[in-house]
Amino acid sequence: MAGRYFDEWTVGDRVEHSISRTVTETDNLLISTLTHNPQPLHIDHEAAAKTEFGKPLVNSVFTFGLMIGVSVNDTTLGTLVANLGYDKLTFPKPVFVGDTLRSESECIDLRESKSRPNAGIVTWAHRSFNQRGELVCECTRTALLQKKPE
């Protein structure tokens, strides 16, 4: 499914994204390596075993990136002018290797662009849940989207 144009969104629209993903150890190691994050809590099984979690936590950059990435097909694919910002990013529960994550997006604000008559600004609340239905990540995202061509 392609993303929606600005004028195809209504405040309150909610999308449950069809893509879910089971997190692997390779995912966690790659994102930690790519972002130069040597935090033992993510990559050192022995060190992580001594924490309250008892095992490595998945790097939150992966969790956030996956949540936003799986939303693109249903929200902004082919209609995005620019991402304007992310806000209120939280990680209420940890993610572990083997967790399966699913995400949803809800349109929470719309406004016309003052400087671009062919575009508008959309704000979504993005949420990601593990296989137990526990909220593991959430944020708001604001983007400038094209209006539907005439």
Language-model features: locations:
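HotDog/MaoC-like acyl-thioester-processing domains
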Residues: 1-11, 91, 95-100, 104-150
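Hot-dog-fold acyl-thioester-processing enzymes
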Residues: 1-85, 149-150
